[in-house]
């Protein structure tokens, strides 16, 4: 006999640059959620931060928010009707801790990291400063502001907005002219920028963590085939052949898994995270790159692939997250 089904509110969209990725991720969730265990409703957030009830059919169209949909005036009262919220939102609104803060204030249960962890992890600079205290190895970097002297910078470098995901606003500069151009581009995404040494001869490696109650399931290592470039937006969400499960040196594999578990705990993450690394092939050194507290759940995203590779079916990944 089946028990009472848990009622789940799935949120997606948002007004961030990663809105489209969220729409792709939510399709993966609804295609894999176990409907023998969960009832669910969809609520989409448009680019103006308006909230709407949405159906599975509506979200097939990426312009779902242009339709005549039922607008939700009070999302708090609406969310209180559900047992748990699954906020499948990338970028600001969720990964910067805003939604979590609101849910915590009203005692609404949700999937994923809390507001404290999300705020720190979303800001690349805060993450770097935090993890430096724990001797986590990182690529040399400088914090850019209007007073930064860029005349002494050694090229190539990689320019990153501090608060933006999906590799948006990130570019590799090979000279001063390109650096100035890419700083301008990065400033469109965030007012704070970091400039890192770009390791040309590298491997981009990733590790996924899924929390199963108090147990942490740490994946094997994924690798991004970057062909000497870097893991940009298209590599993450368009070019399906750019991700593989990597066979790597046993010691390096264990080093990555141990760092990942430690970082997850240091940053007080909850539920899930994907942790990214750069491996310098010349110096044989591993560097932490970034942590993602709500990784993509598209058909080609690394997080579900890596966890699935541990033997956990896609639907069971979602079930574990919803049953925490």
Predicted regions and their residues:
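Glycine-rich phosphate/pyrophosphate-binding beta-alpha loops
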Residues: 91, 167, 224-227, 292-306
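Hydrophobic beta-strand scaffold residues
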Residues: 40, 109-110, 138, 157, ...
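Active-site nucleotide/adenylate-binding loops and adjacent lid/helix of ATP-dependent enzymes
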Residues: 2-12, 16, 24-27, 79-80, ...
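ATP-binding N-terminal substructure of ATP-dependent carboxylate-amine bond-forming enzymes
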Residues: 2-116, 121-122, 126, 145-148
């Amino acid at each position: 006999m089946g028990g009472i089904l848990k009622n789940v509110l799935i949120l997606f969209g948002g007004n961030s640059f990663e809105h489209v990725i969220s729409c792709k991720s939510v399709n993966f969730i609804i295609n894999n959620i176990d409907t023998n265990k969960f009832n669910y409703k969809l609520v989409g957030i448009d680019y103006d931060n308006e909230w709407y009830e949405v159906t599975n059919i509506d979200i097939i169209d990426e312009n779902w928010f242009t339709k005549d949909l039922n607008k939700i005036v009070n999302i708090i009262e609406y969310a209180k009707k559900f047992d748990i919220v699954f906020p499948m939102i990338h970028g600001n609104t969720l990964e910067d801790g805003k939604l979590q803060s609101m849910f915590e204030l009203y005692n609404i249960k949700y999937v994923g990291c809390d507001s404290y962890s999300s705020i720190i992890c979303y800001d690349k600079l805060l993450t770097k400063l935090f993890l430096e205290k724990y001797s986590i190895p990182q690529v040399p970097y400088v914090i850019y502001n209007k007073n930064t002297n860029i005349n002494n910078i050694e090229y190539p470098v990689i320019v990153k907005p501090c608060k933006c995901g999906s590799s948006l606003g990130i570019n590799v500069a090979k000279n001063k002219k390109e650096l100035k151009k890419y700083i301008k581009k990065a400033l469109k995404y965030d007012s704070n920028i970091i400039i890192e040494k770009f390791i040309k001869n590298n491997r981009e490696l990733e590790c996924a963590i899924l929390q199963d109650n108090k147990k942490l399931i740490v994946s094997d290592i994924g690798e991004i085939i970057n062909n000497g470039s870097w893991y940009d937006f298209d590599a993450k969400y368009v070019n399906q052949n750019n991700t593989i499960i990597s066979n790597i040196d046993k010691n390096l594999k264990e080093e990555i898994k141990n760092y990942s578990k430690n970082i997850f705990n240091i940053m007080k993450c909850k539920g899930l995270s994907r942790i990214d690394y750069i491996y310098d092939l010349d110096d044989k050194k591993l560097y932490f790159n970034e942590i993602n507290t709500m990784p993509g759940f598209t058909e080609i995203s690394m997080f579900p692939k890596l966890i699935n590779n541990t033997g956990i079916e896609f639907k069971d990944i979602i079930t574990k997250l919803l049953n925490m």
